[in-house]
């Protein structure tokens, strides 16, 4: 038996079967390895944002990895050599430690210390790769084409050594410093956080808001009204702060006198009398009495000071300041040179027996403190205040602002450079450049780098008892200083390293900090290559990296820290392009979370949905817009594109094998439909290449859906009879050649987005390479493009779609010939001739607008007219409805209004509608503004022809059910009602030719299939002709 040139696929083949077949093929043929080793004349530097593998990958990770893969595959096909096409794993930090704490049942840091840092860190090391196999399995299933054999891992000594080099560089340049200050602090994790970590954890909460009266030390029966949303800080009050330029009033209310911002007095007091006004600067220096007599106020406190941060938008215009618990407060305390009152321990509990709430978590004490204030007549007003408050982005505990020693990177000193280098980055979406990301850069704060924790990259700072400091930048430097380098650079082993101080000779020990894990991931640019200790990384050519992408929250996470570190280390931006991805929501549009029970894990979902269908869905709309994860939408998008292309390929392969078609390049006969489709292919290639280059991958998907619609519902529907024609002339060769050309182009253009399906089509078309992913991305050929022809054919297609819609609206089947179609608009007669078979009408006429079977009808727009005309509105409406709409339109056109019985109606008060002749149904094409009319009347001849076509369709369905080849001849038996019998007698030859029937016999035989057509019973049986 002769082998088939083109594989004929089972009609029931699914995308799941295709994906599985191609994945097996790739593994059998080592396709990934061949992609990885593919050369190129241009360099593309990739950087994978490292996830932590101690948790399962969710559906959002699948989307991120899909977009990374699209970029990699496209650039491989466009002659780029991909540098560092590897994965990465983030290994350190609170996320890992918290999972370890859960495992052991720990709740405090002291429990970890008692258990043993060595054992704790060993568990952290083992746990981080718990789900790495699942991550790699998801990467396989989704088609992520990276080399996991070369993954960078942030816990490796080489990686951390590169970070040490960077930290020493920063220290030597004066950009890394230590300070005692108030920092964002998590009492659960007992460590400080950086500003970019804090930015990821804000929630809207309702906190108690209190207006408290502080008694003046110098004026009788006089008080300062201070406002706070943290009552727990009141025992530590040291100052009251006013804005020096704001206006304040001394008012009399409730039998006492109060200083308050002038604009806020009416909010705080229902009734008051203003005594006098002054500016905030006039209040500076005034003294007041301690509010709560529990702690000893330091010398120099309990006075009014100035602060420009005070506003009158809410509160009282006077802010209570506790320097221990606020950044602005601390700065005031520092400027005033006073000691700070801190009765709170590192667990966030009051830890001073003089305070009545000793031992209580500070935020839990708020209500008790309000009761105390009220009881002691210190409270003027109490309410709930909704505001945005920071929570630990890892453990969800409310943060405190707390005084600590900490190491900082002086980001504020390079703020101008950060903003300048941001201008070099191509952002998708572009509004992030000067929006969410750019605004954050413009307010960049010094980076709180140190963490008082256990599992992380150790801070390489050694100090002696005399305060001398040595920053180490490599393992060799430790040896040179006389220390012994441990095999593992983590705690507790690195803590045991000692050496003599090069300045005074005393023993030096390491400061017991690890660094922010964001510094780990932000160092991937260079540390993944063990820079500068190995020579496989060149900052001149490898920075900036070409492209990065992660979820929207990383604009203040990984995107930010990459940019900061590259600016400091290499004096340039970290990346050329960045694409930010929005969240995948559940089917109801809710954000997914474990607590809601609506999380979707990638592996589970990929076991239900074919990967190409999911990948296509991810780009069904811009990736920076959120999407509801809806299987119905996924199936619909897949059906309209991939399944439609599969059916087109099936049609092509079946017929091409019958005619023994062989691809020998594009061979066109001049047929207008072929020229149109070939032009469409090249337009599709051009627009898709532009979209890939601009990172608008959703535009490729949109263009592909339009292309598939043009190919299947327009080109193939109008061309299919050419494939069925006897013989093999130039016109038939041109049709095969065009269809092959279109299918192959689709497989190559869509290869980065739907890699499995594209390779399936490409391989079955007999592509030259082992995989479409080893092909070059197609180039468009401008000599084959005809924009005028495309426009004319697109207009014709829009007419066809409009006629289909009018048929459906008027219950006229597509196989029923219409008596007449009238078309008014910009259309060519020659194009109508090309598409008239699809329009299925006895008569098709191009007419002028003034020949349309339509009249204009005028009416009032009641929403506009009624308020003006009032009681006369019904009379005027009756009159305008009786007028000729054309005359109303003429008056408006000539005079700018229409006048009825002395009433002047402006154009916005009048609605003019087009009302078709009752014999016609009318609509306008969605594009191009072409008017289309179909005659709704069906005469007897047209009705009988429609019945004949219905018979043909049923016989063809039965041929398909019997798996007959197109060339198989049949004998057809029919048992018909009178109308169908009349239709058969009139159109017998047509029915024979369409169904390959040698003869049609009207009789009753065994095994006939019953159909109901137009309410009439029709029985059919077909036999192979002998």
Swiss-Prot record:
IleRS has two distinct active sites: one for aminoacylation and one for editing. The misactivated valine is translocated from the active site to the editing site, which sterically excludes the correctly activated isoleucine. The single editing site contains two valyl binding pockets, one specific for each substrate (Val-AMP or Val-tRNA(Ile)). The lineage of its organism: Archaea, Methanobacteriati, Thermoplasmatota, Thermoplasmata, Thermoplasmatales. It comes from Thermoplasma acidophilum (strain ATCC 25905 / DSM 1728 / JCM 9062 / NBRC 15155 / AMRC-C165). Keywords: Aminoacyl-tRNA synthetase, ATP-binding, Cytoplasm, Ligase, Metal-binding, Nucleotide-binding, Protein biosynthesis, Zinc. Its cofactor is Zn(2+). A motif ('KMSKS' region) lies at residues 591-595. ATP binds at residue 594. One of its GO terms (biological process) is isoleucyl-tRNA aminoacylation. A motif ('HIGH' region) lies at residues 51-61. This is Isoleucine--tRNA ligase. The keyword Nucleotide-binding applies. Monomer. The keyword Ligase applies. Catalyzes the attachment of isoleucine to tRNA(Ile). As IleRS can inadvertently accommodate and process structurally similar amino acids such as valine, to avoid such errors it has two additional distinct tRNA(Ile)-dependent editing activities. One activity is designated as 'pretransfer' editing and involves the hydrolysis of activated Val-AMP. The other activity is designated 'posttransfer' editing and involves deacylation of mischarged Val-tRNA(Ile).
């Amino acid at each position: 038996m002769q082998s088939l040139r083109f594989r004929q696929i089972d009609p029931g083949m699914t995308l799941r079967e295709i994906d599985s077949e191609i994945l097996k093929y790739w593994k059998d043929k080592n396709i990934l390895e061949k992609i990885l080793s593919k050369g190129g004349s241009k360099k593309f530097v990739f950087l994978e944002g490292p996830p932590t593998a101690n948790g399962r990958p969710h559906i959002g990770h699948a989307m991120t990895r899909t977009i990374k893969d699209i970029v990699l595959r496209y650039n491989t096909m466009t002659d780029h050599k991909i540098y560092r096409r590897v994965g990465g794993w983030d290994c350190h930090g609170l996320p890992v430690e918290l999972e370890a704490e859960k495992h052991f049942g720990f709740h405090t840091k002291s429990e970890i210390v008692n258990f043993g840092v060595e054992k704790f860190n060993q568990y952290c090391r083992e746990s981080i790769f718990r789900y790495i196999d699942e991550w790699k399995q998801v990467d396989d299933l989704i088609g992520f084409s990276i080399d996991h054999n070369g993954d960078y891992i942030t816990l490796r000594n080489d990686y951390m050594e590169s970070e040490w080099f960077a930290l020493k560089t920063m220290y030597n340049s004066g950009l890394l410093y230590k300070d005692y200050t108030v920092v964002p602090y998590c009492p659960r994790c007992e460590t400080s956080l950086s500003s970019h970590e804090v930015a990821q954890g804000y929630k809207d909460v309702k906190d108690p808001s209190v207006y408290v009266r502080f008694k003046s030390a110098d004026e009788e029966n006089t008080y300062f009204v201070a406002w706070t949303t943290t009552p727990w800080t009141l025992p530590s009050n040291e100052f009251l702060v006013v804005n020096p330029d704001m206006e304040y009033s001394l008012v009399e209310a409730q039998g006492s006198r109060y200083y308050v911002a002038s604009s806020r007095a009416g909010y705080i007091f229902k009734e008051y009398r203003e005594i006098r006004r002054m500016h905030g600067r006039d209040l500076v220096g005034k003294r007041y009495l301690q509010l709560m007599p529990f702690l000893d106020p330091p010398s120099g406190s309990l006075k009014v000071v100035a602060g420009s941060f005070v506003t009158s938008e809410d509160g009282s215009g006077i802010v209570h300041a506790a320097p221990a618990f606020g950044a602005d407060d601390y700065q005031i305390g520092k400027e005033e040179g006073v000691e700070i009152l801190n009765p709170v321990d590192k667990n966030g509990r009051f830890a001073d027996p003089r305070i009545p709430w000793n031992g209580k978590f500070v935020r839990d004490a708020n209500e008790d403190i309000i009761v105390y204030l009220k009881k002691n007549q210190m409270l003027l007003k109490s309410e709930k205040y909704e505001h945005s408050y920071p929570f630990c982005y890892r453990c969800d505990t409310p943060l405190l602002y707390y005084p600590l020693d900490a190491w900082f990177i002086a980001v504020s000193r390079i703020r101008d450079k950060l903003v300048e280098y941001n201008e070099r980055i191509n952002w998708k979406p572009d509004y992030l450049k000067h929006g969410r990301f750019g605004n954050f850069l413009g307010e960049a704060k010094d980076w709180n780098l140190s963490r008082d924790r256990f599992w992380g990259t150790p801070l390489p700072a050694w100090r002696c008892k005399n305060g001398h400091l040595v920053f180490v930048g490599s393992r060799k430097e430790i040896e040179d200083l006389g220390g012994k380098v441990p095999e593992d650079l983590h705690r507790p082993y690195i803590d045991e390293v000692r050496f003599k101080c090069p300045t005074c000779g005393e023993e030096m020990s390491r400061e017991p900090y690890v660094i922010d894990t964001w510094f780990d991931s932000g160092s991937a640019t260079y540390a993944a290559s063990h820079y500068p200790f190995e020579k496989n990384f060149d900052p001149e050519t490898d920075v900036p990296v070409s492209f990065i992408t992660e979820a929207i929250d990383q604009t203040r996470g990984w995107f930010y820290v990459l940019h900061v570190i590259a600016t400091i280390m290499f004096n340039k931006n970290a990346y050329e392009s960045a694409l930010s991805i929005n969240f995948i929501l559940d089917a109801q549009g809710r954000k997914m979370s474990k607590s809601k029970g609506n999380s979707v894990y990638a592996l589970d979902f990929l076991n239900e949905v074919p990967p190409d269908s999911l990948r296509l869905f991810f780009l069904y709309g811009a990736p920076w817009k959120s999407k509801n994860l809806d299987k119905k939408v996924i199936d619909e998008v897949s059906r309209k594109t991939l399944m439609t292309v599969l059916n087109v390929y099936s049609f092509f392969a079946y017929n091409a094998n019958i005619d023994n078609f062989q691809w020998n390049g594009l061979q066109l006969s001049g047929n207008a439909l072929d020229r149109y489709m070939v032009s469409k292919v090249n337009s599709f290639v051009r627009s898709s290449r532009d979209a890939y280059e601009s990172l608008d991958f959703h535009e490729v998907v949109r263009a592909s859906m339009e292309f598939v619609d043009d190919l299947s519902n327009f080109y193939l529907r109008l061309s299919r009879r050419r494939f069925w024609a006897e013989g093999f002339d130039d016109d038939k060769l041109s049709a095969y050649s065009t269809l092959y050309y279109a299918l192959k182009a689709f497989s190559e253009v869509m290869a980065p987005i739907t890699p499995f399906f594209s390779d399936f089509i490409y391989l079955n078309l007999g592509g030259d390479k082992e995989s479409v992913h080893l092909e070059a991305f197609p180039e468009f050929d401008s000599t084959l493009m005809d924009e005028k022809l495309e426009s004319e054919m697109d207009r014709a297609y829009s007419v066809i779609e409009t006629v289909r819609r009018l048929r459906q609206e008027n219950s006229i089947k597509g196989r029923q010939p219409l008596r007449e179609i009238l078309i008014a608009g910009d259309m060519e007669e020659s194009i109508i001739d090309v598409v008239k078979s699809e329009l299925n009408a006895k008569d098709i006429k191009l007419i002028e607008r003034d020949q349309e079977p339509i009249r204009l009808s005028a009416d009032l727009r009641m929403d506009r007219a009624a308020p003006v005309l009032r009681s006369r509105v019904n009379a005027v409406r009756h009159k305008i409805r009786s007028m000729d709409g054309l005359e109303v339109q003429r008056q408006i056109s000539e005079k700018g209004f229409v006048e009825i019985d002395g009433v002047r109606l402006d154009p916005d008060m009048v609605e003019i509608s087009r009302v078709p002749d009752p014999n016609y149904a009318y609509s306008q094409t969605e594009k191009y503004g072409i008017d289309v009319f179909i005659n709704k009347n069906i005469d007897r001849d047209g009705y009988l022809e429609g019945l004949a076509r219905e018979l043909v369709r049923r016989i063809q369905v039965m041929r398909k059910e019997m798996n007959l080849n197109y060339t198989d001849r049949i004998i057809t038996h029919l048992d018909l009602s009178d109308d169908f019998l009349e239709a058969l007698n009139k159109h017998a030859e047509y029915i024979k030719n369409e169904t390959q029937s040698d003869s049609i016999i009207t009789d009753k035989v065994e095994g006939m299939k019953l159909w109901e057509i137009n309410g009439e019973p029709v029985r059919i049986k077909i036999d192979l002709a002998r």
